[in-house]
Each structure stands twice: as structure tokens, then as C-alpha cells.
């Protein structure tokens, strides 16, 4: 380890006893935060420790080889269950579900809105959501009702968490809330279209009457919370949008601005799958896995939010 308390990719691979390709895969998925120094990627010691702690607690399948595509099927021709969503809680759910249904679920790492559209098109069985609707002040239900037209569904809470802004340590630009993002001296790092964080930002800018074109950095995109936090930590942006849990691993300060509801939706026609998911979410084992993670609140975990 060097004097800055960080590791090269080769060193991380050696410590984890995996290949460099596996380490790059973890970084790409946002499971392991990293940043660039010149042409070299580095991983902070504390981030590596946190990753190893999360692995011991949950052993999520996200840390294994890249997931198979949705088109793949088991030998008997029956397709695997597909879970779409980027949060580690979905990796933990996948592991529990594998034991419950004796089948390895496939994982798709897509944003909330894009995943919901995939479900409508028959490409996903379980979709995680954190989509804020400014008109109603609600999370998820308004979007699910609009998009899953004619499809009876069950919307169930997974966790409650804080969403807001990542800022550099010490908050040198004195960023306090959404309105500060229109300042000319503030550069943000944005999220991809269809992600819950992008929807949250766009809804908040709309409430303030701010034109996205006036926000410096609005067109700069990353595809997960950890990458957003890493961009802020490295000084490439002054603020990023995301959930609290990534701030700890991304070595940034966090400004909480809204209580976020992270839910999953399952179509009711998948009766056995829905039954298994409800049992897992209400189990003490699953809640215990989540309670060990930074910034996760489980008081509503397993509660049915809406069903049609």
C-alpha cells in the first residue's frame, strides 16, 4: 500500500484473490468505488474494507462473474427469474431467492424507470424503484400505475433511505440544497436518463423553475451512485445526486434532502415468485442483512405499499 492509503487494481486483485478483470467488473457495477490518478485506477483502503465487510454480511452475487443475459434459459427451456436494479439490497434479495426457489436469478443493473419499462415489455420479473413524483410528493406508485397499465401488480417496500447531494469534504462551496445547483460556480455530475437519481433531480429543478441547460455539468453522466460520489471526491464535480450509503464509500460529505422510498414491484400473475419475495422481505434474516448497511432503514421493509 502506498502513502496515500490506496491500492492499485493489481494490489486489489491480489488481496481479494481474484483477477484484475473481476476488479474492473466490480468497479464498473459500482460495487467497489475507485478513482483515477493520471492513467491509473486506485481504490482507497477504507472503500476496500467496506466492500469486504459488505461481502461478509450479504455475499451478494454482484461480486461474482457478470450476470447472464435475460434471453438465456435453463436446460429445460424455462427462463431464469430476472431482477433489475442497481442497489446492493437486490443482490442480497437474489441470494435469498436462490435458496427459496432453487434457481439462480439473473441480475440486470438498470435504473428505475428503464427497469419498469422493461417489466412492461416482459423482460423483468422483479424491479426495484426509487422514482419521485413532484406532483403528488410520492415515490414509485404514480409511475407504476401509469406504466404497468392493465397489469395487476404488487408494490412492496425494501428500505427507506436518505437521498440528496454528495459534496466534497468540508463542503467548500457551501452547497445547501437543490437551488444551489443553478449557481455558475457549481459543477454537478448527473445520472443517466431513467435512473431514480436523475428523475429526482429533474423533478426538483422543475419545482424550482430551473432550466436544466442552466445547470453546469448537467450533461456529464455516470451510471451509479458510487461513480457520482467518486467524481465529487476526486474534484471533477462539486456536487452529485444520490443516496446516503454511497457517500461513506465515496469519501464525500452528504447533504440529505429527501426521505427516499426504495420499493420493488412484482406482477401478481407470478404468484409463486411473489409469495417467495414477500416471505424473504419479511424475514428477520433479510432485514438483518440490510440493517448492517450504512443509511438503510428497515421499519417498512416487507410492507405492501400498493397492489392492484
From Swiss-Prot:
Q: Which InterPro entries match?
A: DNA-bd_dom_put_sf (IPR009061), HTH_17 (IPR041657), PBP_domain (IPR024370), SinI_DNA-bd (IPR010093)
Pfam annotation, one family = PBP_like
Q: Which Gene3D superfamilies match?
A: Periplasmic binding protein-like II (3.40.190.10)
Q: Which Cys-Cys disulfides exist here?
A: none
One Gene Ontology MF term? DNA binding
Query: NCBIfam families in the record, alphabetically?
Result: excise
Q: What is this protein called?
A: Uncharacterized protein YvgK
Q: Please give the organism.
A: Bacillus subtilis (strain 168)
**Name of the gene:** yvgK
Amino acid at each position: 500500500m502506498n502513502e496515500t492509503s490506496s491500492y492499485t487494481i493489481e494490489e486489489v486483485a491480489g488481496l481479494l484473490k481474484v483477477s484484475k478483470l473481476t476488479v474492473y467488473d466490480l468497479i464498473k457495477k459500482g460495487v467497489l468505488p475507485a478513482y483515477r490518478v493520471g492513467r491509473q485506477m486506485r481504490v482507497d483502503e477504507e472503500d476496500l474494507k467496506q466492500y469486504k465487510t459488505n461481502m461478509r454480511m450479504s455475499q451478494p452475487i454482484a461480486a461474482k462473474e457478470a450476470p447472464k443475459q435475460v434471453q438465456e434459459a435453463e436446460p429445460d427451456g424455462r427462463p431464469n427469474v430476472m431482477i433489475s436494479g442497481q442497489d446492493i439490497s437486490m443482490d442480497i434479495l437474489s441470494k435469498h431467492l436462490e435458496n427459496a426457489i432453487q434457481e439462480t436469478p439473473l441480475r440486470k443493473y438498470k435504473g428505475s424507470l428503464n427497469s419498469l419499462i422493461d417489466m412492461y415489455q416482459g423482460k423483468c420479473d422483479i424491479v426495484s424503484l426509487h422514482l419521485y413524483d413532484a406532483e403528488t410528493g410520492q415515490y414509485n406508485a404514480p409511475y407504476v400505475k401509469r406504466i404497468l397499465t392493465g397489469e395487476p401488480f404488487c408494490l412492496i417496500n425494501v428500505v427507506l433511505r436518505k437521498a440528496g447531494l454528495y459534496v466534497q469534504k468540508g463542503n467548500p462551496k457551501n452547497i445547501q440544497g437543490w437551488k444551489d445547483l443553478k449557481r455558475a460556480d457549481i459543477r454537478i455530475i448527473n445520472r443517466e436518463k431513467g435512473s431514480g437519481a436523475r428523475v429526482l433531480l429533474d423533478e426538483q429543478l422543475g419545482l424550482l423553475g430551473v432550466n436544466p441547460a442552466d445547470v453546469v455539468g448537467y450533461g456529464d453522466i455516470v451510471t451509479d451512485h458510487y461513480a457520482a460520489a467518486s467524481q465529487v471526491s476526486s474534484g471533477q464535480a462539486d456536487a452529485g445526486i444520490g443516496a446516503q450509503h454511497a457517500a461513506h464509500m465515496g469519501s464525500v460529505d452528504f447533504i440529505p434532502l429527501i426521505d427516499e422510498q426504495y420499493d420493488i414491484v412484482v406482477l401478481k400473475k407470478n404468484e409463486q415468485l411473489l409469495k417467495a419475495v414477500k416471505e424473504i422481505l419479511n424475514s428477520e434474516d433479510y432485514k438483518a442483512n440490510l440493517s448492517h448497511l450504512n443509511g438503510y432503514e428497515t421499519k417498512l421493509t416487507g410492507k405492501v405499499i400498493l397492489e392492484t
